[in-house]
Amino acid sequence: MKKMMMTAMMILVAALCCFAGTHTHTITLVSRVEKQDAQYVIRNAETGATGASVVYCTDEIARQDVGTSFDIIQCNDSNGINKVHFTVSATELQAKVGGKLYGTNGVQILMNGVACGSEVSFTRTTVGAVAAGTVVEGFEVIWPTNASLVDATYEACVVLTATSL
């Protein structure tokens, strides 16, 4: 009897771990940061959009996911010293059940595992040409899941802005 109860508890714990995981996937948010007359142009690798800032909305994320990982990848063609100031904002969060949308709150941007609120800024310096594919910074956007929306899929909207210094 005791052995059966322990086995049942182990199965229950394993099942809970499957649904409470912190699975994330990586999306290349920026493939190039190009300098043009003291301005930086960002190109979104997923959509091809360019500009001084780029908005990226994730695809639907499965209900057991609690966040999405992003990489900022910088590539400059010049041979000088380049300083780029990045600002990341998580501006919208929503959960979808069937055709209905529900707002969620508590969004956090994590840099190196530290929660920084819904907006974070940082500056990076590059000297000379930076090889394509060099990761300048990685970050996660996380938010709490709502127990009453157990069948929801979640979407996050992230804005990345780069300015020259």
Feature names for model-found ranges:
Residues 1-4:
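Positively charged n-region of N-terminal signal peptides that target proteins for export
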Residues 6-7, 68:
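Short amphipathic alpha-helical "recognition" segments used for binding
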Residues 8-15:
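Bacterial N-terminal signal peptides
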Residues 20-101, 124-165:
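N-terminal small/polar-rich segments of proteins
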Residues 96-117:
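A surface/secretory-pathway sequence property marking extracellular, secreted
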Residues 115-126:
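Short, solvent-exposed S/T- and G/P-enriched segments that are highly enriched in secreted/extracellular
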